[in-house]
Amino acid sequence: MIYEVRTYTLRPGTVPEFEERYAKRLPARLKHSQLGAFWHTEFGTLNQVIHVYPYDDLQHRTRVRAALAQDPERNALPGGQEFIVAQEAEIMTPAPFMRPLGSRDYGAGNVYEMRTYTYAPGDLPKVLEAWAKAVPAREELSPLAACWTSELGGLNKFVHTWVYKDVNERARVRDASRAPGRAWPPQSGVRPIRQENKLLIAASFSPVR
């Protein structure tokens, strides 16, 4: 299993229209493969939409992308290309301890925090080992929706996405996770060389809400 994470930066004020068009084209898109998640940014880099598609492997993705290019039903509908300022696509591999995206129901109206850590080459195995031990206790406070390492695109990235009811719960959980007696953050013996985060809101049609 791999996940393609596509991030589009849009012109200010166009996110609602882009999502509306995406929703209209989605039934045709779903004939080819399933959507994993669709979010837009609330904090962090603004005016971004992030859509995630799971595939069996790279060959599966290639077949789907080729079929999409030839799909007259989908291509007849406006997609919003005129709104796009920049596009980025990355292929992610799920961490061994990650549950499949969308395999749990978090309800609706949630906030998702996507944190991306970039490590020095060779450090990710240590990070994965430490996180595998620490995640079960951390999930007592809030669910881990996704955890990936980058395979294609920007390399040496570790991406983890957490679910919160709102920004206030996020603050409470982060304080609680660092309380005495809790082994968080995981101690891998290595530190990221770069960190960034985004707070995300799911689109109305996103399977992960």
Please describe what each predicted stretch is.
Residues 1-209:
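Short S/T/G/P-rich N-terminal loop/turn motif that feeds into the first structured element of a domain
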